[in-house]
């Protein structure tokens, strides 16, 4: 039983990453080369992918709101990786035992930096006892190296909030 659950989790994580890649490719193929793309379009596609991965016993809603941040074609895959990982982590860990819940993804555009926040109303987590998975490490390094920003977490009994910053496309080369 435990092995089967682990195998299912690994397959779901792989499927989530594959769906993210497909979404990025689909959105990029509809635009012109080098043109910025809509962050909200990407987030809608990623939220749809996440909803497909929910089982019937999971009662989790996902909403999106905020500014439509323009993303460069170079930023888009990195944003997709980070958002997919954060939403997948919330789905897998924030709502144990069939607990109902909500995940919100919101965007705030800034002149130099823009921000994306993934927040859940789940159980929260203790970063000292969290699993040894490398998803958060990948998220942090992706935000720092590809988006030139930072990733921060706030967690407690009312849920978890992850916020990452990224340079706006006009400042990417700095």
PLM-predicted stretches and their roles:
Residues 102, 124, 156-163:
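Glycine-rich nucleotide-binding loop
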Residues 120:
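Acidic ATP/Mg2+-coordinating residue in the GHKL
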Residues 1-10, 32-33:
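Short acidic helix/loop segment immediately C-terminal to the autophosphorylated histidine
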Residues 37, 55-84, 91-101:
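Conserved short strand/loop->alpha-helix "switch" segment adjacent to the catalytic nucleotide/phosphoryl-transfer site
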Residues 106, 159-170:
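Short C-terminal beta-strand
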Residues 11-19, 23, 27, 36-53:
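Short beta-to-alpha transition helix within the HATPase_c
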Residues 100-112:
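Short beta-strand/loop element within the Bergerat-fold HATPase_c
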Residues 127-154:
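ATP phosphate-binding glycine-rich loop and adjacent ATP-lid/helix-beta elements
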